Curated annotation (Swiss-Prot):
GO terms for biological process: endocytosis; Golgi to vacuole transport; intracellular protein transport; piecemeal microautophagy of the nucleus; protein targeting to vacuole; regulation of SNARE complex assembly; regulation of vacuole fusion, non-autophagic; vacuole fusion, non-autophagic. Essential for vacuolar biogenesis, maturation and function. Involved in the sorting of vacuolar proteins from the Golgi apparatus and their targeting to the vacuole. Acts as a component of the HOPS complex that acts during the docking stage of vacuole fusion. HOPS is an effector for the vacuolar Rab GTPase YPT7 and is required for vacuolar SNARE complex assembly. It remains bound to SNARE complexes after vacuole fusion. Keywords: Phosphoprotein, Protein transport, Transport, Vacuole. It comes from Saccharomyces cerevisiae (strain ATCC 204508 / S288c) (Baker's yeast). The gene is VPS33. GO terms for molecular function: ATP binding. The modification Phosphoserine is found at S626. This is Vacuolar protein sorting-associated protein 33. GO terms for cellular component: CORVET complex; cytosol; early endosome membrane; fungal-type vacuole; fungal-type vacuole membrane; HOPS complex. Gene3D superfamilies: 1.25.40.850, 3.40.50.1910, Syntaxin Binding Protein 1, Chain A, domain 2. It is found in: Vacuole. Belongs to the STXBP/unc-18/SEC1 family.
Length: 691
């Protein structure tokens, strides 16, 4: 079992796989036609120079509506160029219409199509190969290996085609402990968790779960890992864990079973642990509607990161492996960015000043050797100084919508201390006095509805009438979709919704009760997000990512290991205070209060039962140590905990989970949280998808 996940290698594995496939297809020069949704991911893995040096690719063009017009010029300049299509249909389950159109219009004699799929396990591939041989298939024919749902669409063409899989692993783009599968949105930019059409939700959820299971399975087999403890929160999360367990069991070999029995047998126990925690977005629909206050979060709210972790309107590359300044600043509260940039500028100036002290040839050589890295660091520092200044200008302008007033209103809604009439007056003020964008107004109204566990009938009708009168009758369709998804409901509508969507996990309590039980709005740290701190200062509570609020998602994960919050705020009758393994015992009543279903949370153990007697030892006696191979130093051994988000994760939640890891570490629970999510989410994306 591997407990050291080198996630940085996943990027290299993906890049090498694509290059090998492109070299396999042809030795002629190639034109790579890339589906637009795939391009940002491709750019994260390879530069154009890397691609042209390692493969026969000489040109790249987009698989868009202009392709049919651009093809003659792309192919005509160089003789004998092969056309290679790169597509991803894992969520849409259909070929891009532009590919079919180009093939028919230009009568392409042979189609070479590379399609994305999650990397299968070696065992699975071996078993499939043996079965194909038994069934008499030609192993050199790629056509028989392709999913039927896509192959049937290709058969409509008279063109010959050859299909090549690009086996992928989720890879780090934001942080080495954050892996995004980019399956939350399909190629039409439909949100698979919150589809605009309610009738599609069952189908899109199934696709989303299947894709996440495939990605998790690829990671588990690639790293040779064994999952020991699993906790699922939410009905969709339980579906995901059940399906993953089934597929892992189906593809286990006798060798796998022998290894697991040796490590976790009746008489022996290796003590290694790997947790899997799965949460779906509806377990906490409130956090994405809040304004984010970390550097990365506020950039996502203002400019929106794409799947290549680049933002609109700004020509910047946020590469955490190259840009150390971005890596240091991304999860800090924005209020501390200025002092940090000032500190980094002084350190850089000090390093430049060492050239005046260089006297010997050796000292001069050392400075010259470091000059390249200093200049690169200076460029990064300049970029982030300019960007943070731009952000500051935007949030300080009234045209943006009174940034501080929105933060204050969010906190008032969460604390439940303000009457609905007062909140409605503030919303009207934001609309007419500050001319706030309607998506932000709608986000605040949805936040109010969720925190009140739906609105009184008269408040609902008042706000609904206000929005229709202000924004037009066509807004009715979006409000209907928001109601069906539980974002904007009346007390009566909430009851009807609960009857028709009994399988969905939804909050059933007003947020003021939730905040009391989980202490999500700590009074002592109410204004912590406004404090100016440096990188050595830690917030005692995780209120730095949002305005005085701790996300419910963090508290749900925290209670699995640390019951101190529930002990002080919900019930003093807790089975433990600290636990190395995630445990849900005696949370059933709390979960039923939250979601109306005590079975919305589920715990399971995927190794022999004796492990619970061995692993659940006192935290104080947990003196496990591991060695860092890079420098030979020892440090506390960390158990890997895979935290999976179905339906998207916010930049703020990522920062909060890293904070929780530190909190648990100080208490002797050494975990390495690796976040795996199907995509990034925030209030703007939700409002855009439900339109």
């Amino acid at each position: 079992m591997n407990r050291f996940w080198n996630t940085k290698k996943f990027s290299l594995t993906n890049a090498d796989g694509l290059c090998a496939t492109l070299n396999e297809i042809s030795q002629n020069d190639e034109v790579l036609v890339v589906q637009p949704s795939v391009l940002p991911v491709l750019n994260s893995l390879l530069t154009f120079q890397d691609l042209t040096q390692s493969t026969p690719v000489r040109k790249i063009t987009l698989l868009d509506d202009q392709l049919s017009d651009d093809l003659p010029s792309a192919l005509g300049s160089v003789p004998q160029m092969d056309l290679i299509f790169l597509i991803d249909v894992r969520t849409s389950l259909r070929l891009p219409p532009q590919l079919l159109d180009a093939a028919q219009k230009h009568n392409l004699s042979s189609l070479h199509i590379i399609y994305c799929r999650w990397k299968p396990s070696f065992q699975n591939t071996l078993e499939d190969t043996e079965q194909w041989q038994k069934d008499g298939f030609d192993l050199n024919s790629k056509k028989t290996h392709f999913p039927n749902v896509i192959e049937s669409q290709l058969k409509e063409l008279s063109n010959e085609y050859t299909l090549y899989p690009w086996d992928l692993l989720p890879f780090p783009q934001i942080d080495e402990n954050v892996l995004l599968t980019h399956s939350l949105y399909n190629m039409e930019n439909v949100n698979m968790y919150y589809p605009n059409l309610r009738s599609l939700q069952s189908a899109t959820e199934s696709i989303l779960v299947d894709d996440m299971v495939n990605s998790l399975q690829s990671l588990i087999f690639e790293t040779n890992s064994i999952i020991t403890n699993v906790v699922s929160i939410g009905n969709l999360s339980k579906r995901c864990s059940h399906l993953l367990k089934k597929r892992i069991d189906e593809h286990q070999t006798e060798n796998d079973l022998f290894i697991k029995g040796t490590l976790y047998g009746e008489r022996t126990n290796c003590g290694l642990e790997m947790d899997l925690i799965i949460l779906e977005r509806n377990t906490d629909p409130i956090t994405p509607l809040l304004t984010q206050l970390t550097y990365a979060g506020i950039l996502d709210d203002l400019y929106e990161f794409n799947s290549g972790i680049k933002i609109k309107e700004k020509d910047m590359n946020f590469n955490y492996k190259e840009d150390k300044i971005w890596n240091d600043l991304k999860f800090l509260n924005f209020g501390s960015i200025g002092p940090q940039l000032n500190k980094l500028a002084k350190e850089l100036q000090t390093q430049y000043d060492t050239r005046h002290k260089a006297e010997s040839v050796h000292e001069i050589k050392e400075f010259v050797d470091s000059l390249g890295s200093l200049q690169q660091r200076q460029a990064f520092l300049k970029n982030h100084t300019t960007l943070s200044s731009d952000v500051l200008k935007v949030v300080e302008t009234e045209e943006y919508g009174s940034f501080n007033k929105i933060l204050e209103l969010e906190l008032e809604i969460l604390m439940g201390n303000t009457l609905n009439n007062d909140i409605e007056d503030i919303i009207l003020e934001l609309q007419y006095q500050y001319e706030v964008d309607q998506k932000k107004i709608l986000r605040l109204i949805c936040l109010l509805s969720l925190c009140k566990n739906s609105l009184r009938e008269k408040d609902y009708e008042y706000l609904r009438t206000f929005m229709i009168d202000s924004w037009g009758i066509e807004k009715c369709f979006q409000l209907e979709s928001l109601a069906e998804l539980g974002f904007f409901t009346s007390k009566t509508g909430k009851t009807d919704l609960h009857i028709t969507t009994s399988k969905s996990t939804r909050l059933q309590k007003e947020y003021r009760y939730i905040s009391q039980w989980f202490n999500t709005v700590p009074i002592e740290d109410e204004h912590a997000a406004d404090k100016i701190t440096n990188e050595n200062d830690d917030f005692s509570e995780a209120t730095f990512a949002y305005s005085g609020v701790v996300p419910l998602t963090m508290r749900l994960v925290q209670m699995l290991y640390d019951r101190s919050i529930l002990f002080h705020n919900y019930s003093s009758q807790q089975p433990f205070i600290l636990s190395r393994e995630p445990r849900v015992s005696q949370t059933e009543d709390l979960i039923e209060q939250l979601y109306g279903d005590s079975h919305a949370i589920e715990e399971s153990i995927w190794v022999p039962g004796t492990i619970t007697k061995k692993i659940n030892a006192s935290i104080k006696s947990n003196n496990r140590r591991s060695i860092d191979g890079s420098n030979g130093t020892f440090h506390a051994a960390e158990d890997i905990a895979l935290v999976v988000f179905l339906g998207g994760v916010t930049m703020g939640e990522i920062a909060i989970m890293k904070h929780l890891q530190k909190i648990l570490g100080k208490k002797g629970i050494n975990k390495r949280f690796i976040i795996i999510a199907d995509g990034l989410i925030n209030g703007t994306r939700i409002m855009n998808s439900i339109s």
